[in-house]
Each structure stands twice: as structure tokens, then as C-alpha cells.
């Protein structure tokens, strides 16, 4: 979210440095983007037989909420939860993220 970008300068610098250190040619990055945009596994999601949780950032502008809800609807028995924050909500708000994930895991041990 904008708040995260405005208040977490040190964290963002660390992330940017880590990304810059990756040895990824432009062609590989573009191929990755193409895969993200064109790879469609929706028809296979109904075959998932393990406990699954879809956890979405309430303010995520990269993955709209309707896509997260669609993903949830296509996985039988999946749990769905939202968390405060955007696409990087696990870094923006790690405590509630960890609580949600650990709570889900605790129910399915």
C-alpha cells in the first residue's frame, strides 16, 4: 500500500537490493510475466485434495479481490480470509498474517 511505501524505507531498500542482486536476464523476466498472464490452471483446481487457504490483501491492486475469491471458489473446501494491506501484506502486517497462517495450519495438523 502507499502507507507501506511511505513508512518502510529501510525494508524497501533491502528488498530492492535483493531483487537487483538476482541474476535474471530481461528475457527471463519477460517470460515470467508472460507465464503469469497466460497460464491458466483453473480447471485443475477442483482436484486439490489438501487443506488450502486463500489469503488476500484487502488493498491489493496487483491481484484484485475478485480473482482471489474466484480462486477460493474453485478449490473444494478451501478457506478464505482477507488481511489488511496490499499485495505485500505479509510484510506490511506480519503479525496478523502469521496468526492467520498458523491458525489455519493448527486446524489441519
Which role fits each region the language model picked out?
Residues 61-67:
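Conserved alpha/beta-hydrolase "acid-adjacent" motif
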Residues 77-109:
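Catalytic active-site module of serine/aspartate enzymes centered on a nucleophile-bearing elbow/loop
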Residues 34, 53, 79-81:
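Structural signal for short hydrophobic segments within the conserved structured cores
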Residues 69-70, 99:
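Active-site phosphate/pyrophosphate- and oxyanion-stabilizing loops and adjacent acidic/basic residues
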Residues 1-44:
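Conserved alpha/beta-hydrolase catalytic His-Asp/Glu region
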Residues 46, 73-74:
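Solvent-exposed polar/charged
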Residues 48, 54-56, 60:
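Short beta-strand/loop motif that positions the catalytic acidic residue
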Residues 49-50, 77:
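Active-site acidic short loop of glycosyltransferases
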Amino acid at each position: 500500500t502507499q502507507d507501506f511505501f511511505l513508512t518502510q524505507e529501510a525494508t524497501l531498500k533491502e528488498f530492492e537490493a535483493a531483487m537487483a542482486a538476482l541474476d535474471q536476464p530481461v528475457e527471463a523476466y519477460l517470460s515470467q510475466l508472460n507465464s503469469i498472464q497466460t497460464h491458466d490452471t483453473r480447471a485443475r483446481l477442483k482436484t486439490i485434495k489438501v487443506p488450502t487457504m486463500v489469503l488476500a490483501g484487502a488493498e491489493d491492486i496487483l491481484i484484485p479481490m475478485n480473482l482471489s475469491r474466484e480462486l477460493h471458489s474453485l478449490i473444494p473446501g478451501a478457506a478464505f480470509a482477507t488481511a489488511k494491506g496490499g499485495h505485500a501484506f505479509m510484510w506490511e502486517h506480519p503479525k496478523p498474517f502469521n496468526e492467520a497462517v498458523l491458525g489455519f495450519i493448527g486446524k489441519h495438523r
